[in-house]
Structures are given as C-alpha cells and as structure tokens.
Amino acid sequence: MPLLDSFAVDHTRMQAPAVRVAKTMNTPHGDAITVFDLRFCIPNKEVMPEKGIHTLEHLFAGFMRDHLNGNGVEIIDISPMGCRTGFYMSLIGTPDEQRVADAWKAAMADVLKVQDQNQIPELNVYQCGTYQMHSLSEAQDIARHILERDVRVNSNKELALPKEKLQELHI
C-alpha cells in the first residue's frame, strides 16, 4: 500500500494550532488544488471532543468560505480528521498559509458569536447523520482554544520523517 502524505510527517514535532500545506496537485485542466492540514490539537496530547468537533464541522465550513473564498480560491471541502486533532481543507487555488490562518481565526471568532444551538446549520434529522450529537459550548471552547494560542505554520520540510525512520517503521 502506498504511503499517504499525511503519514510521511513526524506527528511528534507538529505544533498546534497550525496550518500546513498537506498536498498540492493539478487537475487535468490545470486547476491547482491545495489540501491544508488545519491542526487544532497537538497530536497524541490533545483531542477535540466528539460533540464539539461535530458542531464545529457544521459551522466551520460556512465560516471559512465566508473568509477565504474569492481572489482565486474556492473551498471544495472541509472535513474533520479521524484522530480528532484537526480538519483537512481541500480547495481550488494556492493561498499562502498566512491567508488561511487569518481566515481560520476569523472563522473561530464567528463560532464564538453563535448564540444558540438552533443557529447551527443543517442540524436536523434530514441533513445530519447524527443530529443529536452536537455541543455548541464544546465547539466554542475549541474556538477559544485556537484564538488564545494563535495559529502557526507547520513546515513539511521541518516535519518530514527521514527515510531511515520510515524504513525502521517498516513503511
């Protein structure tokens, strides 16, 4: 099985919160696609709570689009990582990490402005697979955590696992 890009970086050295370009590619028509690792938590030390990350998933996607789409950028998808330490964001375009970090912080400020669980988009049995598994207060705790610590940039060059380590891990 081929080694996925996300497993070629050293998770023990990742900073959080931080933005990292996880992958870049071009479509057959030449459009640039960038996948960002938006790392909310330090891997293996912190984790976002289940209900909070789910609520954040509903809010974050719209708020990030409000702040990042335009000027050659269009978000395709924002999805939580299975390890619950962050989100992957796929988009058309090549914004720099600082632009993404600024949009992320603005989106977190928007999360803090949501006053009632009824304001969470698609929070109903028809549009959500686990519509009762939500917590606005947990999502807002996550947002506060990001804004209190600021957002850094994780460099692939600094985080790359050496070939020797990959061989040692039998990858």
Swiss-Prot record:
Cofactor requirements of the protein: Fe cation
Binding note for cofactor: Binds 1 Fe cation per subunit.
Binding site residues for Fe cation: 54, 58, 128
UniProt KW keywords: Autoinducer synthesis, Iron, Lyase, Metal-binding, Quorum sensing
Gene Ontology cellular-component annotations: cytosol
Name of a matching Pfam family: LuxS
Keyword Metal-binding: yes
EC number in record: 4.4.1.21
UniProt entry tagged with the keyword Protein transport: no
Signal peptide stretch: none
Enzyme class: lyase
Tree of life domain: Bacteria
Similarity section: Belongs to the LuxS family.
Subunit composition and interactions: Homodimer.
PANTHER family registered for this protein in UniProt: S-RIBOSYLHOMOCYSTEINE LYASE
Cited function: Involved in the synthesis of autoinducer 2 (AI-2) which is secreted by bacteria and is used to communicate both the cell density and the metabolic potential of the environment. The regulation of gene expression in response to changes in cell density is called quorum sensing. Catalyzes the transformation of S-ribosylhomocysteine (RHC) to homocysteine (HC) and 4,5-dihydroxy-2,3-pentadione (DPD).
Family annotation (NCBIfam families): PRK02260.1-2
Protein name: S-ribosylhomocysteine lyase
Gene transcribed to yield this protein: luxS
